[in-house]
Amino acid sequence: RILNDMLMEAKTDVVVNYDTDVIFPPSSYLIAYDKITKLGYDLVYPYGQGEWQYKVTVNQDLINDLVNSDWSHSAFEDHDAKEKSTSDYGWAQFFNRKSYIEGGGENENFVSYGYEDNERPERFERLGYKVGRVDDTIYHMEHVRTMNSWFTNPHIENNKNLYERLKEMSPEQLKNYYDTVEYMRKRHGSK
């Protein structure tokens, strides 16, 4: 809900849904922004799909290197405690703000962790929005998972069922769902 609150309050043409535990090369931010403002994309992932993720173990050496490098992302590039992994969806998305709102924003019926990151790009593609990527690295700072930030959360089955139901909808049904879902009606002043 808070993400949608911020989306509605934003005044910029480009907005970013950004997890605080990731960092990208500076060029990725600029390319993602340009893809929206100059090339007409509606949704851009600022990292590649496939083997583009580095899982980074945060330790005192990394913190020291980060501070001593004037906060340069090169501290992550040079950090030994990282391993290559896959990347698909989640972490950060750049949006054309208007398209994000028209496409339903963040689905508030997903609760806690799970399946919202899978549903979002599928929805935007199926609704005809232009979705793209920046083929570059993502550094994900590994962290402890609580019950609510993993597949162990008590809402995971409901989230999965919602995702499966939305996947089965035609583009017209999906558009109708997002046009009439309660949280969007409230935001647009309808009951």
Each model region followed by its residue ranges:
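Glycine-rich, basic loop-to-helix element that forms the pyrophosphate-binding segment
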Residues: 1-9
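Alpha-helical elements of Rossmann-like donor-binding domains used by nucleotide-donor carbohydrate transfer enzymes
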Residues: 5, 31-32, 119-123
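Conserved catalytic core of nucleotide-sugar-dependent glycosyltransferases
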Residues: 7, 25-108
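Short, high-confidence coil segments that cap the C-terminus of an alpha-helix
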Residues: 12, 40-41, 129
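Short beta-strand-to-loop acidic/aromatic patch adjacent to the donor-nucleotide binding site
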Residues: 13-23
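Short, conserved alpha-helical segments within structured domains
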Residues: 20, 91, 116-117
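Short, solvent-exposed loop/turn segments at secondary-structure junctions
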Residues: 21-23, 49-52, 100, 137-139, ...
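C-terminal catalytic/acceptor-binding lobe
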Residues: 87, 109-191
